[in-house]
Amino acid sequence: GYSSAASDVYKRQSIIDGVRLCKAKRYRYANANMEELEKCLQEAQAQRFRIICTDGVFSMDGNVAPMDKICDLAEKYDALVMVDESHSAGVVGATGHGVSELCKTYGRVDIYTGTLGKAFGGALGGFTTGRKEIIDMLRQSSRPYLFSNSLAPSIIGASLEVFKMLKEDNSIHDRLVENVNYFRDKMMAAGFDIKPTQSAICAVMLYDAPLSQRYANRLLEEGIYVTGFYYPVVPKGEARIRVQLSAGHTREQLDKAIAAFVKVGKELGVLK
């Protein structure tokens, strides 16, 4: 075999499509499970090239990939590392510089991908960055890039301004962290089952699929827009409401959302 890709089972759909397009031999490991990743890399030694593909922050749970351990294994088994920073860039790390800042893996990751549709202004489009040789090759041979329209100048301009703001001022990022901690702590104190998070994603676990949809619909009636996820988007029996916090949320808005969660929770028997 020529190449192989080992990827986390909770990876984004874009990584799934990318692995399919590159026709590499596929290996999958359980979410953030380094023992399984090591077994995948051992099996992949027969291939000439190996790449580990992971999200920086996993979109359904909000947990962070252990990038330092992933990079250690990549060096041990001579593999490239690709991380999708869509949910982590602008959010994770002391200054919002993503999982490489949080895990101190600058210079150890070969390819970064990300989106302009989340922390960087909520527009559309995305980016890939890495060593010049890799980017030059992608410019010439990446079909999704080659045969897509260019982004509008207004989107590029706005996104560059967001990059500049994040680099010069940490106050927006600090406000986001405060909001996430406040919402999570208040929700847990109210009795909700919240997944541990180091990101702006807060997963309120309900486990029952129909309940997650009824809950989301009732919250919308209360003026709170959230999404209920269930199988096949998440594993069976792992239905949840995903809440994404923003630096733009005021304390009053967060209190309104928490009050609505509690009210509906009591109505539907989630809270006693």
Indicate residue ranges for each PLM-predicted region.
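Helix C-cap/helix->beta junction micro-motif
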Residues: C22, K76-Y77, A190, E222, ...
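Active-site phosphate-binding strand-loop segment of PLP-dependent enzymes
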Residues: Y27-V83
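Active-site C-terminal subdomain of aminotransferase-like
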Residues: Y77-L80, H87, V92-Q198, L211
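Conserved PLP-binding catalytic core of the aspartate aminotransferase-like
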Residues: D174-F183, M188-G223, V233, G237-E238, ...
